[in-house]
Amino acid sequence: MKFSEHLAFLREQEGLLQKDLAKALGISLHAYQRFEYGEQEPRLAVLAKLADFYDLSLDALVGRRRSVRVTALLENTAGREGLCAAHGLSLYIETPRHKILFDMGPGDEFLSNAEALGVDLTAVDLAVLSHGHDDHGGGLAAFCRVNDHAPIYLHRSAFGPYYILSDDRDPAYIGLPLGLEEFRDRFIFTDREMVIDRELTLFAEPPAVFDAMAASGRLAEKVGAGFQPDAFRHEQNLLIRAAGRTVLVAGCAHRGVVNILTAAKSKLGEYPDVFFGGFHLFQLPEGEAASDKLIDEIGRALLPGKTVYYTGHCTGAYAYDRLKTILGERLRAMSGGMTAEIGADGIREHR
């Protein structure tokens, strides 16, 4: 996308006319039109005003970041030598406006991986926790100690008493670590939906148009002296609208990837371009996969639209291979160290 095209895109995204921008910049309509038509480059002073108007850095305005770049800091598998792997997920996301940490994995493994990948976590300006399980939020304290300023968006129910049940052992606590009170002033608690800005929206509790909770049957919430199935009201998803593309990011999609995708479609008017996250079709501690019937139904339900799916973590190898026969090249594996850059010219992968 040329700079002139980028200017037009930004203006149209805000629902503004050319004369509105000219007035805001204190220049004539003709002068502004020359910028959008590619007849003249703005002077630095005008660029600074444009950047301030759109709340962008100069780099983002002039196109040094005209894409959404997603790097898997941590996943169950490591795609590069020297990186840690652990059961969990942590993604680093760069947009024209933001540097985002989405989930922190089970511990501090994501820190060494970030260093090895050249990711500066001190520059992260906001973090998102997808849900209240320790394989996604176990590294929360580690992040807060490395980065002392980024707000952390998490659902108001994220600190619930969440457990995994087993036939032959006691219920195991899998909620967020205790002792995070010292960082409470960093937390921004969300509910069903929160619009952070024009790029980022968080949403939870997608309507159940598809029954996909069977794969989460052993996951529970403690209520009094007993347990009840976890309804995953504490799970939220990140919808990104940036660089002319739409990206949907989920942690485990416990509420069902089809339901989450359908909710995103209702907000966008179309399916997102790219999805990142687990499908939760692999159940610990026993390690059984979801039924072939459920996997196939999900695969067929994901066919409409042109969304490219990057998945891993709790999807499981068996389910991934089976889904691959249905979705083909639209299904791609996540692994630690991989990067996908989503821009106007498509997706560029680095592994």
Task: Set out the residue ranges of the language-model regions.
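Short basic helix-loop element that most often maps to the first helix and adjoining turn
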Residues: 5-24, 49
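Recognition helix of helix-turn-helix/homeodomain-like DNA-binding domains
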Residues: 26-42, 63-64
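DNA major-groove recognition helix of helix-turn-helix/homeodomain DNA-binding modules
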Residues: 45-60
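Short amphipathic recognition helices of helix-turn-helix/homeodomain-type DNA-binding modules
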Residues: 60-65, 170
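Conserved beta-strand hairpin/beta-sheet module of binuclear metal-dependent hydrolase folds
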Residues: 68-117, 231, 235-250
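Active-site metal-binding motif and surrounding structural segment of the metallo-beta-lactamase
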Residues: 109-160, 266-275
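Cap/insert and terminal regions of metallo-dependent hydrolase folds
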Residues: 134-136, 151, 229-237, 241-336
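Metallo-beta-lactamase
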Residues: 158-236, 332-349
